[in-house]
A protein has these predicted regions:
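ABC-family P-loop ATPase nucleotide-binding domains
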Residues: 1-31
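Helix N-cap at the start of a conserved alpha-helix in ABC-type nucleotide-binding domains
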Residues: 55-57
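Catalytic Walker B motif of ABC-type/P-loop ATPase nucleotide-binding domains
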Residues: 44-48
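Conserved catalytic motifs of ABC-family nucleotide-binding domains
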Residues: 40
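C-terminal coupling/interaction segments
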Residues: 127-170
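ABC ATPase nucleotide-binding domain "signature" loop
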Residues: 51-53
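ABC transporter nucleotide-binding domain
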Residues: 61-76, 80-138
């Protein structure tokens, strides 16, 4: 879709009149992302799509993804920057040491696990990290409380406590 390609280029602040070979790698990457989403292919595979992008370009990419994806599209993102895509995910696969450690929908994760910030460490905590504001913990979601999974905290928990996390989904 040419109109969408133009819109994506504008969103990512790419000059359409400049030759791709004359711009920086970052600008080339943004142009390729703009093109990929304008194609409306059923599958898009991205490896570290936000590496090398500044904050405004990352935000623009999220807007493009939100606008471009639908129920007929699958977007597979390999990234170490999970927070860049937290609000766009509906399924999560965590890999470690060549194995699939977690493969669940975000709905299932939030139904089974509660991500909570507390002053004291809850006894039932599956995984927790402490900072100046208290403990950020993953707990069993026994009451079905609505919450948003913290992907980075979950990633660390899956790597450090794989059996505990796995047991929450059995």
């Amino acid at each position: 879709n040419q109109e969408e390609f133009k819109l994506n280029l504008e969103e990512l602040k790419i000059n359409r009149k400049q030759k791709l070979s004359s711009v920086s790698y970052g600008q080339q990457k943004k142009a390729m992302l703009a093109y990929a989403f304008a194609l409306h292919t059923p599958y898009i595979l991205l490896d570290e799509p936000t590496n090398g992008l500044d904050i405004t370009s990352r935000q623009a990419l999220k807007r493009i993804i939100s606008r471009s994806m639908d129920d007929e599209s699958t977007l597979l993102i390999s990234t170490h920057q999970a927070h860049d895509f937290e609000n766009l995910l509906d399924h999560l696969v965590i890999l470690g040491k060549g194995e699939i450690l977690l493969n669940r929908s975000l709905d299932e994760i939030s139904n089974r696990l509660l991500f909570a910030r507390t002053d004291i460490l809850p006894a039932e905590s599956i995984y927790s990290e402490q900072d100046l504001s208290g403990h950020f913990s993953i707990l069993p979601n026994e009451d079905g409380e609505e919450n948003t999974p913290d992907i980075e905290l979950l990633y660390k928990a899956v790597l450090q406590q794989p059996e505990k996390i796995k047991s929450m989904f059995q």
